[in-house]
């Protein structure tokens, strides 16, 4: 793979022994061996994936060839009906794009919201209704509060309100009910 001979490998080992020493050299060799193992597995994985992709591409190409061959071997009736469908589709495209090609392409890429439209198109032919009578509110100004009100009038009105509340209190009747029975 790297085209390294035995003599080069022995030279690297001796230099490593001199630089790292006898205690750290085995740890360094294990670490380098782990890196090499990881690189080899990565290369193998990439190679397998490329092979699978190439096989898939070849399969798709052969499938397209078979489809073309089957289309060429169709009966004349099926070919005629396919040609008619193609002509109808192209005529529809031409009539649609003949109106305004630029507008047709803009319309194809536009999302329409039926709720938000112009008032002219939404209310075409509709006239607003006229009201027979128009309501109006009377113009009133608030009356000024009188500051010179005697206190006796104020207390009398409060006493009247208290008396009305007491007379409006509900009357409770004491009658035996079913819950009072033993």
UniProtKB/Swiss-Prot annotation:
GO terms for molecular function: protein transmembrane transporter activity. Residues 168-182 have a biased composition (Low complexity). Residues 87-107, 121-182 are annotated as: Disordered. It is found in: Cell inner membrane. Keywords: Cell inner membrane, Cell membrane, Membrane, Protein transport, Translocation, Transmembrane, Transmembrane helix, Transport. InterPro entries: TatB. One of its GO terms (cellular component) is TAT protein transport complex. It comes from the Bacteria. Its main location: membrane. The chain crosses the membrane at residues 1-21. It is a single-pass membrane protein. One of its GO terms (biological process) is protein transport by the Tat complex. Belongs to the TatB family. The Tat system comprises two distinct complexes: a TatABC complex, containing multiple copies of TatA, TatB and TatC subunits, and a separate TatA complex, containing only TatA subunits. Substrates initially bind to the TatABC complex, which probably triggers association of the separate TatA complex to form the active translocon. Part of the twin-arginine translocation (Tat) system that transports large folded proteins containing a characteristic twin-arginine motif in their signal peptide across membranes. Together with TatC, TatB is part of a receptor directly interacting with Tat signal peptides. TatB may form an oligomeric binding site that transiently accommodates folded Tat precursor proteins before their translocation. This is Sec-independent protein translocase protein TatB.
């Amino acid at each position: 793979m790297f085209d390294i001979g035995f003599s080069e490998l022995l030279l690297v080992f001796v230099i490593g022994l001199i630089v790292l020493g006898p205690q750290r050299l085995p740890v360094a060799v294990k670490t380098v061996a782990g890196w090499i193992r990881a690189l080899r597995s990565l290369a193998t994985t990439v190679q397998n994936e490329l092979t699978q992709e190439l096989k898939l591409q070849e399969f798709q190409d052969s499938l397209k060839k078979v489809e073309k061959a089957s289309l060429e071997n169709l009966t004349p009736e099926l070919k005629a009906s396919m040609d008619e469908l193609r002509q109808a589709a192209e005529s529809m495209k031409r009539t649609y794009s003949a109106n305004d090609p630029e507008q047709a392409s803009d319309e194809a890429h536009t999302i329409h919201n039926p709720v938000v439209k112009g008032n002219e198109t939404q209310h075409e032919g509709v006239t607003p209704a006229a009201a027979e009578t128009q309501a109006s509110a009377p113009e009133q100004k608030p009356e000024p509060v009188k500051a010179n009100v005697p206190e006796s009038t104020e207390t009398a009105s409060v006493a009247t309100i208290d008396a009305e509340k007491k007379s409006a209190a509900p009357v409770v009747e004491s009658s035996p009910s079913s819950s009072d029975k033993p």
